[in-house]
Amino acid sequence: QSFGNQWARGHFM
């Protein structure tokens, strides 16, 4: 799991 992925989900989505 990548922490960057969760961050992107909240910023891009």
UniProtKB/Swiss-Prot annotation:
Expressed by the skin glands. It holds the Pfam family Bombesin. It is found in: Secreted. GO terms for molecular function: hormone activity. The keyword Ribonucleoprotein does not apply. It comes from the Eukaryota. GO terms for cellular component: extracellular region. The modification Pyrrolidone carboxylic acid is found at Q1. Disulfide bonds: none annotated. InterPro entries: Bombesin (IPR000874). One of its GO terms (biological process) is neuropeptide signaling pathway. The modification Methionine amide is found at M13. Keywords: Amidation, Amphibian defense peptide, Pyrrolidone carboxylic acid, Secreted. Belongs to the bombesin/neuromedin-B/ranatensin family. Possesses insulin-releasing activity. This is Bombesin-like peptide 2.
